[in-house]
Structure formats: structure tokens, C-alpha cells
Amino acid sequence: PKKEVALIETSKSFARKIIDLCCPEKNPQRKEFSSIEGVESFIKQLGGEYVIKFDGLMGGKGVRVSGEHLKNIDGGVAYANEIVRVGGKFLIEEKLVGEEFSLMSFVDGNVCKHMPVVQDHKRAYDGDTGPNTGGMGTYSFENHSLPFLSEKNIKEAQKTNELVAKQLFEETGTPYVGVLYGGFMLTGGGVKVIEYNARFGDPEAMNVLSILKSDFLSICISMVDGSLKNQDVSFERLATVCKYVVPVGYPDKPTKNFEVFCDQNDPSLFLASVMLKDQKLIACGSRTAAVVGKDKDVFQAELFAETGIANISGNLFHRKDIGTKKLIDSRIKRMKELLK
């Protein structure tokens, strides 16, 4: 998309404003700040259940959550102070509780064609522990849904992407052309928006593009020339599990400049933060490589992903629990309790 509408990703406050205009019920309670004034009282107003978001891009690491990264109100005030010191603006939002999912849509400025929904895992370590990352891995089901989502939930998210694309045009006069990525959360109070991105999700793109049946170039051309309505966009009925291997110490103090050994001819392998030096693959410090497993059964797809990862070596680690029965069952159980 063009810069005017890509602001949906680069400015958290602009994104919330757009959502307010077209589907305000999808926004959490929130307030914008550029100074420390009023921060403590608003956090108290939210009952100490809050999220602080830097109003800009920080590689998926500018969000701090109470009870996870921020242990108390003083921790929240201290992080707000950090942002103010570098001249930044930030949002404080109510903390939403539920299960996150990603829905990406192809958009030609008028028509949206939706991709299968995917669930990302931001935390660095097994069991959803450790610091936030750009995303350690993702999974999608063969029915293009997720086990804790209803058809109604998915339709709601699709409608939200459509309304947001339309509102962006109305607000800026610039049609949104490209991939629109909605980050959603299913809560006890329904589907809410966490954030928007003006691009493919990483790792989510590897899940959906791995099962895309239609010609990708044709889809891109149809977005640009406004003919997406007549373009076939279809996906194989397969489950996918994508897992990243990352340097030890990632994301805070990643090791760098070590050799990575892998089968570069493996079609399920996607190299990322590496460089070729003297015919050797060298890790650069961010997420190193991803492997995608595909099958009609998500747990078999997970085993395929693990098999691919077993062929990669270096000073690396990955999350073994993504796409496993234990983790997926815990997500279903948690959502059932929230929806009681």
C-alpha cells in the first residue's frame, strides 16, 4: 500500500482512530500520551490491567503487558518514562484476555479476498514464557479456521478487515492496495482488534502461501489493476505448522556470526536472518530460518516441521510446543472458560 494508508501499521493511534470510525466496538478502552502526566491515574482506572504500546515501529517488541513484562504500576510508569525520554508517544490500552489470531486479506482498494486464519506465538520459550519476539512460529488448520474460533468469529474478523480497508480510503482518499493483516483476539466479550499491519505477517505468510493454489503473481496483478473480484483466490485444505529456529540469546542478547548447517534444497526451509560468507551460511542475530510442515492433520504437520528442524544445526533453539496437541488443547480449554 501507499504511505498514507500504510500508517495503519506505523501509527498505533491512527489505527485506533480508523477502527473508531468504522467499528468502534472492536477497540479496547484506551488513551494516548506524549508525557507522563495522567499515566498513573489511567493505569489505576484500568484496575492495573493494561498494555503500553509505543506509537511507532519497534519490530514487534514495543509492546509491554501488565502482569507479564510490567510487574506493577511503578513498572508501567517507568516504561512510559523511557518512551517520553526519547521523545516518543504511546498508547495505554486495557489488557484484553483471550486467544490471538491473524487474518490477512488481499485488497485491491475495493474488494477483499481473505486468507486462512493463523495463530502466531510471540513468546520466546515453550509454554508461552519469556520475552516477546517477532514470532516464533504459527499453525493453521485444514479447514482454514482455528479450533477455538466459530464461523461467526471468522466472518466478524473478515468484515472488520473490509470495513477498515474502506475507512482508510474514506479517511485518506488513497485506496488500500496490498495485503492487510489484522491481528485479532477472541475475548469473553467477542472479537477485538489488537493491531493492524500493512503487509504479510511473518511467520503467517509462510503458512498461507505454502497452501495457496491460485497463481500468486496473478493475485498481485489483480490487486494493482483493481480486478481482484474476478481473480480466483483458493487454498489447499491442508493444516500447516511453521517453526523458527533462532540464535541462543534471542531476542534480547542473540549470539551472532556463527555458521548454520542445513539442507538448502529442502523445499520446506525458508532462510531468514543469514548471510553467505565464503560459501558458508552465517547467522546475523535475528530469526535464522523457518520450516513449514503440511498435512491434512495438524499434528502430523507439526511432526514434519520438527523433522525439518532436526536437519538444521548451529547455536540455535526453537519452540518445540507450537502445533502440539498439548498446547492447542490448552488454548481450546482456556477459550471455553472465558466464553462461559
Placement of each model-derived feature along the sequence:
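Peripheral (often C-terminal) accessory segments that flank ATP-dependent C-N-forming ligase machineries
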Residues: 222-340
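Short, conserved charged micro-motifs
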Residues: 38-39, 71-75, 149, 153, ...
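Structural element of the ATP-grasp superfamily
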Residues: 19-20
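A short, GP-enriched loop/loop-strand-helix hinge that lies immediately N-terminal to
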Residues: 1-11, 23-34
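Internal nucleotide-binding/catalytic subdomain
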Residues: 47, 63-203
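Catalytic-core regions of core metabolic enzymes
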Residues: 4-6, 39, 256
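Active-site "cap" helix and flanking loop/linker of ATP-utilizing ligase/carboxylase catalytic domains
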Residues: 155-181, 197-266, 276-277
